[in-house]
Curated annotation (Swiss-Prot):
CDD domains: ASKHA_NBD_HSP70_DnaK-like. The lineage of its organism: Bacteria, Pseudomonadati, Pseudomonadota, Gammaproteobacteria, Alteromonadales. The gene is dnaK. GO terms for molecular function: ATP binding; ATP-dependent protein folding chaperone; unfolded protein binding. Pfam families: HSP70. Acts as a chaperone. Residues 626-640 have a biased composition (Acidic residues). This is Chaperone protein DnaK. InterPro entries: ATPase_NBD, Chaperone_DnaK, Heat_shock_70_CS, HSP70_C_sf, HSP70_peptide-bd_sf, Hsp_70_fam. Belongs to the heat shock protein 70 family. Residues 601-640 are annotated as: Disordered. Induction: By stress conditions e.g. heat shock. Transmembrane segments: none annotated. It comes from the Bacteria.
Amino acid sequence: MGKIIGIDLGTTNSCVAVLDGDTPRVLENAEGDRTTPSIIAYTGEEILVGQPAKRQAVTNPTNTFFAIKRLIGRRFKDDEVQRDVDIMPFKIIGADNGDAWVEAHGKKMAPPQVSAETLKKMKKTAEDFLGEEVTEAVITVPAYFNDSQRQATKDAGRIAGLEVKRIINEPTAAALAYGIDKKQGDNIVAVYDLGGGTFDISIIEIDSVDGEQTFEVLATNGDTHLGGEDFDNRLINYLADEFKKEQSLDLRNDPLAMQRLKEAAEKAKIELSSASQTEVNLPYITADATGPKHLVVKITRAKLESLVEDLITRTLEPLKVALADADLSVSDINEVILVGGQTRMPKVRTEVSEFFGKELRQDVNPDEAVAIGAAVQAGVLSGDVKDVLLLDVTPLSLGIETMGSVMTKLIEKNTTIPTKASQTFSTADDNQSAVTIHVLQGERKQSSGNKSLGQFNLEGIEAAPRGMPQIEVAFDIDADGILHVSATDKKTGKAQNITIKASSGLSEEEVEAMVRDAEAHADEDAKFEELVTARNQADGMVHATKKQIEEAGEALPSDEKEKIETAMAAVDTAVKGNDKEAIEKSTQELMEASSKLMEIAQAKAQAEQGQQAPEGEAQAAKPDEDVVDAEFEEVKDDKK
């Protein structure tokens, strides 16, 4: 059986980890980074993911997608989506089923389809490390993700060619990463997870008995549309307002300028975590009839904190609710773990520390802990990790709509999963032959205030006065937190059941079509990779040849030099095209044309060696003081 990998599919950055022996290991991607920006660009020729996508975002803002996780499993008309429509440089549209989709080069795409590109890169990173195909994964989601968002995440995994063995909550994964090597005693841990697009708080009890560890989630709460992106947006809007005051021009109407502003705001926010002041300097940000305009704004840490103060305060209310749900007070919490890049902001750390009245743990990497926890859970599922039991909860209450548009709860929030619950209902009218089961998720009493997950009909109920038929509705939540609902007429035994896919979401046919599309692109991607390799080899050959020509100097006859330069020009022309065979052929011809250069280089080397021999013999008697030349690879520091 192949390895099951652990993936943290983040709003801003994603990360992949795998068990290496019995130790979780975060893997470096092709660029040498341990985290990958969750940015996907469609250039018209190819799909770029991560750092390459980020680099070209300024020149291709309308086809470069970031923070796509904020749209996953959401309806276009949702208030949170409408807020993003106004500020994102790319196009967010309403799909036929009412979902929020995006558009690139006129092609409409579902968020799971776009997120699948990030998952594919994570899959490839793991395959490069393991040297074998990877087909199974544990993927993390915010604890406060609803059923639709969890289902959409599983769809993204399928489109990427992964069987999602388990969906696990991000704070729970972080607690696994923290607690897996701490075998002693019992601990109650608060995991404060403020990532790029989502916020979660989970209260988790870690028990160690006779070498067995139990991670039990006592309560969870959060906001799936609050994160680092919102902090960035406050800064972006501030910069745009300052520019408008000074120049009477609104940069919000210019996608290219907004993309540059976004990059600058993110950079400034990160700098202000260690510096007390920074300057945003963007020359030629736009132009009008009077000429080009430049943006230069100084920002202090205090100014940034004042811009985002209410966002930080917004995270404190869920903390109070989670503690109340767990029936605990602040003094009952033993450790506080911070997860998510936005927790590096000093003001966030101060507020959380003051709320809990204790020092924060500093030994958990906020960018990598979630992926490490996912890899541990993957190890539990594959049997590589023993004596670990994970008891997660459902974040929101689940129920059905009953008479008077009331939500009747069958499963309360913070119930340990997997779980089952059933209740018997009846008809509202005499001789009613069918009932509609409308499944809801949320905490409001009124049905319309909750998230509609889907509905189905139970038909063929025997004629009877209202209140007489006995209809049993059963809810079954699996370990992924995904809901299965059934309704049974107790008298006739007629039953109807569904796995909730949300009232919208992707149909089975759509997911399969996207899987096929992804497989077709895999062939294209492989061909493109071969083309890039051929181009790189050709460029390398031209560079080396030019250097050899310089070194050869007068020793190279002019006719030979002319022949080589003609061959180099042919390579340059071929590299600009898309014909791999033509590039390889011209590279080979350049190698053949350069044979004279090789002869000259060899003769020169032999001559130098002959001169150095006596000197070398004299040196041999001395102690070895030579410095050995070595090539060192740059080890990139952990990024935000």
